Amino acid sequence: MPRMTQLDLIRNFSIVAHIDHGKSTLADRLIQLTGTVAERDMKAQILDSMEIERERGITIKANTVRIDYPAKDGRTYVLNLIDTPGHVDFAYEVSRSMRAVEGSLLVVDASQGVEAQTLANVYQALDAGHEIVPVLNKIDLPAAEPERVKSQIEDVIGLDASDAVLISAKSGLGIPDVLEAIVHRLPPPKGDREAPLKAMLVDSWYDAYLGVVVMIRVMDGVIRKGDRVKMMQTGAVYGIDRLAVLKPQMVDIAELGPGEIGVLTASIKQVRDTRVGDTITHEKKGCAAPLPGFKPAQPVVFCGLFPVDANDFEALREAIEKLALNDASFTYEMETSAALGFGFRCGFLGLLHLEVVRDRLEREYDLDLITTAPSVVYQIYMKDGTLQELHNPTDMPDLTYVDHIEEPRIRATIMVPDEYLGDVLKLCQDRRGIQLDLSYAGARAMVVYDLPLNEVVFDFYDRLKSVTKGYASFDYQITGYREDFLVKMSILVNDEPVDALSMMVHRDRADMRGRAMVEKLKELIPRHMFKIPIQAAIGGRVIARETISAMRKDVTAKCYGGDATRKRKLLDKQKAGKKKMRQFGKVEIPQQAFINALKMDS
């Protein structure tokens, strides 16, 4: 069984890149070239284990692989690669993966240049004190402009890119240079073997056979199979059943020393018991203080998930419980809706996280789901001095008791080609944005805006992509809460409020949102035998109304000629019947109407 490795022969690194700049392909090539995985087992995106990761071409969970590399100087180095997500929703996964390694490869597409997410992740790498090696990928494309992109890296990020490694991950060109750069330009880890054990919990996932598998980076001390270890945040103590390194499959190892990255299993039942970023130490003679920088992931966007068929509720509950085993940042609680029946109110890190969870539920568990409009967490300050958090617009307290409402704001960074800048600025202004900064890097503008998160969760990303023909890239950080004039808008169908369609809106945009919603519902709800009013209301005041006219039977058809009062009598009788029908009749709103109404383009 392999023993631990000397510190000066270890290199821990991550790959930082925007979506689609070739990060997972580069990881594949490094694994392939060093023979870590046999040729027959190789497949594209080998580190992306979820089907949805391969299909969308994105990395969601941080994955790791240990590569043995015989360098040109005659020594064999151990390279630990942590493949991090590139998307903003998973920024916490990125931040703690960054703390587990000492260096980063910054991969930039030589034809596209620096994008917004590249920036966000590079800043995290710099915060973690990384040495960064720039790598220009896709240099064999006809549109590649390595010199322009090098100067862009220097202008926008401030990194010296003169000795950037030029590669094509797809064809394998330049990959040996990357391996040499990792060995010679990235620093070895520091650590003291004799000190008490201090290891950082980088990630954890649920395995049907092993229970929870925990990925750790040892900072100080040595961890061995059979040790009893303690999680410093939760105080839980476990005995280690198995220690291994990932190549990407598990290979057992006797011990892990400073600077090494590996996995352990210890009969842990739930992923929730292992807080990512937590510090692991020995139960006896443990370290004095935990590692800094731990914070539990907070859900930011909430929405309701309901089964289309009410009989699927139990299946949905089981699916959500299984999914939550593997995703500690996803929260859920039961809720009932008069319109949609039983379902769950779920919390997510962001919109992509929401989409990924919904897709996984539908695909892996074969469910049909309705998603209610996403909402953010509002802070409601009451007149009696108390503070309430509002996750669901239907729970909004009576306005007479409310002093003011605060909403979360974000700092959005948008990189956009110059010719689309005007459209992007207009979009941000329409969404109540405040411009903070505007700068240029070559032919691309970088705009920084302060925006309300509420305006972004709905369809901001889709609108941004459509006004820039897909060329803009967008990244955000949540900055805090600020007071604004927010109101709850209810939708009434036949004078009955429909809870699933109520939403929080800004007072200035309420009329427009309300009008758009009632017009859309008028198209979607089928006609009934009586007329149906559809209203958007704030409190008791109706701000928009449409009426679906009734279907009408010709009751006077059998009156040929004759007295007009005879016809009048029949029409009055029909009218009275319709009035009674409207009073007692129930309006059937088809499920498809909900789905389409919630997709509403604002």
Curated annotation (Swiss-Prot):
Its EC number is 3.6.5.n1. It is a peripheral membrane protein. The keyword GTP-binding applies. InterPro entries: EF-4, EFG_III/V, EFG_V-like, EFTu-like_2, G_TR_CS, LepA_C_sf, LepA_CTD, LepA_IV. It is found in: Cell inner membrane. One of its GO terms (cellular component) is plasma membrane. It comes from the Bacteria. It catalyses: GTP + H2O = GDP + phosphate + H(+). Keywords: Cell inner membrane, Cell membrane, GTP-binding, Hydrolase, Membrane, Nucleotide-binding, Protein biosynthesis. PROSITE patterns: G_TR_1, G_TR_2. Its main location: membrane. It is an enzyme of class 3 (hydrolase). Residues 8-190 form the tr-type G domain. GO terms for molecular function: GTP binding; GTPase activity; guanosine tetraphosphate binding; ribosome binding; translation elongation factor activity. Coiled coil: none annotated. The keyword Nucleotide-binding applies. Pfam families: EFG_C, GTP_EFTU, GTP_EFTU_D2, LepA_C. GO terms for biological process: positive regulation of translation. GTP binds at residues 20-25, 137-140. Required for accurate and efficient protein synthesis under certain stress conditions. May act as a fidelity factor of the translation reaction, by catalyzing a one-codon backward translocation of tRNAs on improperly translocated ribosomes. Back-translocation proceeds from a post-translocation (POST) complex to a pre-translocation (PRE) complex, thus giving elongation factor G a second chance to translocate the tRNAs correctly. Binds to ribosomes in a GTP-dependent manner. Belongs to the TRAFAC class translation factor GTPase superfamily. Classic translation factor GTPase family. LepA subfamily. This is Elongation factor 4. It comes from Cereibacter sphaeroides (strain ATCC 17029 / ATH 2.4.9) (Rhodobacter sphaeroides). The lineage of its organism: Bacteria, Pseudomonadati, Pseudomonadota, Alphaproteobacteria, Rhodobacterales.
